[in-house]
Curated annotation (Swiss-Prot):
Keywords: Copper, Electron transport, Magnesium, Membrane, Metal-binding, Mitochondrion, Mitochondrion inner membrane, Phosphoprotein, Respiratory chain, Translocase, Transmembrane, Transmembrane helix, Transport. Gene3D superfamilies: 1.10.287.90, Cupredoxins - blue copper proteins (2.60.40.420). This is Cytochrome c oxidase subunit 2. Its cofactor is Cu cation. It holds the Pfam family COX2. It comes from Daubentonia madagascariensis. Residues 1-14, 88-227 are mitochondrial intermembrane. Cu cation A1 binds at residues 161, 196, 200, 207.
Length: 227
């Protein structure tokens, strides 16, 4: 959940988001070290007299500034590729959900069950109850079990949308005529909010996403009430 004036990421609720946070910290440390080196070099140039103005060849320096950037690129690329493969890996999902984007609402279909489809519209400000969040609440939440691998199929019936839930590390484009997929596995129950992250028209800002993650036994009871 995001907080007012928050400067960092939301708390991770899935293994993928935890990996993304580690990768962010790893990359940020490399950027900090490079920035420090550049600032140190600039300060030396400004505070010392010019030397080696007649140097025509510096083999050692050329070797360093060729090898060092290559090492830095490798240190960034390897963990990045690892996370990319993790995000695309879907092994024996326990549940499959099909998400369809519309202007301007979402439709969720639980493909493992018959006639298990519903629309999810934003709750208007006048209908909010105390404690609910403006522009983030919906009339029908997507209810999912925790600690189980879940596959989400994402597409659109009109224009480009993007199904995004930051705390789970999810962002999948909804493209008309194309079926994209992503996977999630929540580590703890709770309400998790997201929004459409692709400009899709006049009411783009009014396409919230709400996931209600609950233990499996409560999810089974919820299914019985919906079927």
């Amino acid at each position: 959940m995001a907080y007012p004036a928050q400067m960092g990421f939301q708390d991770a609720t899935s293994p993928i988001m935890e990996e993304l946070l580690y990768f962010h910290d790893h990359t940020l440390m490399i950027v900090f070290m490079i920035s420090s080196l550049v600032l140190y070099t600039i300060s030396l140039m400004l505070t010392t007299s010019l030397t080696h103005t007649n140097t025509m060849n510096a083999q050692e320096v050329e070797t360093v500034w060729t090898i060092l950037p290559a090492i830095i690129c490798i240190l960034i690329a390897l963990p990045s590729l690892r996370i990319l493969y993790m995000m695309d890996e879907i092994n024996n999902p326990s549940l499959t959900i099909k998400t369809m984007g519309h202007q301007w609402y979402w439709t969720y279909e639980y493909t493992d069950y018959e006639n298990m489809t519903f629309d999810s519209y934003m709750t208007s400000t006048n209908d909010l109850t105390p404690g609910e969040l403006r522009l983030l609440e919906v009339d029908n939440r997507m209810v999912l079990p925790t600690e189980l691998p879940i596959r989400v199929l994402v597409s659109s019936e009109d224009v480009l949308h993007s199904w995004t839930v930051p705390s789970l590390g999810l962002k999948t484009d909804a493209i008309p005529g194309r079926l994209n997929q992503t996977t999630l596995m929540a580590s703890r129950p709770g309400l998790y909010y997201g929004q459409c992250s692709e400009i899709c028209g006049a009411n783009h800002s009014f396409m919230p996403i709400v996931l209600e993650l609950i233990p499996l036994k409560y999810f089974e009871k919820w299914l019985l009430t919906m079927l």
